């Protein structure tokens, strides 16, 4: 664990995309908008992503790769970077979490934690 691990805060907003979903075919599309906030004193570049996605049946998908939405953004101190992406689940409920692989301006590699967040049809849970 690096001292820089807490310098990045990740906020998430999710949305069910009804128009592109097909519940009769067990296809539930969700979008998620991620805001990555650099609370640190130096710029940080997002190099990799690692997601764990679990649906209500316990099916686990793992996604790893370079950057996000085709970018590897450098986030200056006290600024934020935002993007929107999506995922398809076989169930109307699921959970996602993971990490971003970051590198600081000084070259130190660290992980930014993406805390678990819920993907759910509106009204499914109270």
Swiss-Prot record:
Gene3D superfamilies: ApaG domain. Residues 2-126 form the ApaG domain. GO terms for biological process: error-free translesion synthesis. It holds the Pfam family DUF525. This is Protein ApaG. It comes from Shewanella sp. (strain ANA-3). The gene is apaG.
């Amino acid at each position: 664990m690096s001292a820089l691990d807490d310098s990045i805060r990740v906020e998430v907003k999710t949305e069910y995309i009804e128009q592109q979903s097909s519940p009769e075919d067990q296809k539930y599309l969700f979008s998620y908008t991620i805001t990555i906030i650099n609370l640190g004193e130096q710029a940080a570049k997002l190099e990799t992503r690692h997601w764990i996605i679990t649906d209500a049946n316990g099916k686990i998908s793992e996604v790893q790769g370079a950057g996000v939405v085709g970018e590897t953004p450098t986030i200056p101190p006290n600024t934020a970077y935002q993007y929107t992406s999506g995922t398809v689940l076989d169930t109307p409920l699921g959970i996602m979490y993971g990490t971003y692989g970051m590198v600081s301006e000084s070259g130190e590699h660290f992980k930014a934690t993406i805390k678990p967040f819920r993907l759910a049809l509106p009204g499914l849970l109270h």
